[in-house]
Amino acid sequence: MMITLRKLPLAVAVAAGVMSAQAMAVDFHGYARSGIGWTGSGGEQQCFQTTGAQSKYRLGNECETYAELKLGQEVWKEGDKSFYFDTNVAYSVAQQNDWEATDPAFREANVQGKNLIEWLPGSTIWAGKRFYQRHDVHMIDFYYWDISGPGAGLENIDVGFGKLSLAATRSSEAGGSSSFASNNIYDYTNETANDVFDVRLAQMEINPGGTLELGVDYGRANLRDNYRLVDGASKDGWLFTAEHTQSVLKGFNKFVVQYATDSMTSQGKGLSQGSGVAFDNEKFAYNINNNGHMLRILDHGAISMGDNWDMMYVGMYQDINWDNDNGTKWWTVGIRPMYKWTPIMSTVMEIGYDNVESQRTGDKNNQYKITLAQQWQAGDSIWSRPAIRVFATYAKWDEKWGYDYTGNADNNANFGKAVPADFNGGSFGRGDSDEWTFGAQMEIWW
């Protein structure tokens, strides 16, 4: 008995050590931004985005507190085989008060198993909700290839000249389909599951310092038995992507060409959309029709120009041509140079221009935006974070068209359509004006 009692403290210590080691193995990653800002004409900070554009130049032009908190852990490992559990909870508030209630979004919860298939060394099996191989332009917060959501897949299969990845994910639309009631009355209240099937071939070395990635995505509306879509709904579509990445000037340049059809055009990033119906009456549900095509040509990157200068840049042309004439032509160009006074202090400027032409009206909206920021960051790279910055932003815009969301679809035949700025004596778009804002912001990723 005495021997047992003497061994007990040692056993407890060993158990505590094991539990401590396991606790220390938890990975904590994430992203956050928050700050305070004012508008020159009075009131809180207002942000500037061109009507019809899918993004905006973000430096000194973000008006919310946003965070993603990721917890993950390698829960099992034997040799080169392992299982990893990953989670991500995100939230966004308007940064107007101390207490701002919000419903967090559970954006990731997945398990990734590496090297589980003997004859596919280096590959990963995964299932669950996941940010899946996302491609974006940081300076405009624009995701041009992103099929994230609940799904499953097999990735990084070594095929000799590259890595092959296969995945299936889902994005549902509210009110996407109906069941038959009586007297030809349909009640569009059932969600429609939109499935996306993704095939990618990446890391193909085609020139010194250059790699090529090719991808095909097929999206479709997956209806339940005895349900139907509204007439004209976009049932399926394709997205084709080619991306060349070149190492240059201690950074990279990415050149991207994408072509999409029908349900893959509205978001243009790989998620299927077009079966959703915002109104019970299918007579007024025309606005979900996105049959047509999209072409996107994009070049972006980040480079170092000597010891003291870094720069991000982007140039993009996007043409969404829809059968219902509600598409757009959008082109944007911008730069973000950074001058480093010390390894932790810099001055950053961002200059961006957007131009969006309405397919329906032929009119154009444009905006110039310039931001000057003094910044303190954890390192001497344009990617170094955390960063604390004080900024001043000036924007000038001239908008000739907007979307008509007055009333509702039952009493407005133009609901959701592009109209000229002065349509029917109204005021659509943001008109011709300018404004400036100033404030302070922190940004961090880890």
Curated annotation (Swiss-Prot):
Gene Ontology terms: biological process:
DNA damage response; maltodextrin transmembrane transport; maltose transmembrane transport; monoatomic ion transport; polysaccharide transport
Give the result of residue 385 to C, as annotated: In lamb1004; reduced starch binding, decreased affinity for maltose, no change in phage lambda binding
Q: Where is this site: Greasy slide, important in sugar transport?
A: 31, 66, 99, 252, 383, 445
Q: Which N-terminal stretch is annotated as signal sequence?
A: 1-25
| This protein's record includes keyword Signal | yes
Q: Where does it live in the cell?
A: Cell outer membrane
Q: Name the principal localization, coarsely classed.
A: membrane
Q: Which residues cross the membrane?
A: 27-40, 65-75, 82-93, 105-115, 123-130, 157-159, 162-173, 192-204, 209-222, 235-248, 251-263, 291-305, 308-323, 327-341, 345-359, 363-376, 387-399, 431-445
Q: Which domain of life is it from?
A: Bacteria
Knockout consequence?
Answer: Resistance to phage lambda. No growth on dextrins.
- Which purpose does this protein serve, as stated in its record? Involved in the transport of maltose and maltodextrins. Indispensable for translocation of maltodextrins (alpha 1-4 linked polyglucosyls) containing more than three glucosyl moieties. A hydrophobic path ('greasy slide') of aromatic residues serves to guide and select the sugars for transport through the channel. Also acts as a receptor for several bacteriophages including lambda. Binds maltosaccharides; when LamB binds starch in soft agar, it inhibits motility.
Q: Which PANTHER family match?
A: CRYPTIC OUTER MEMBRANE PORIN BGLH-RELATED
Give the protein name, as stated in the record: Maltoporin
Query: From which lineage does this chain's organism come?
Result: Bacteria, Pseudomonadati, Pseudomonadota, Gammaproteobacteria, Enterobacterales
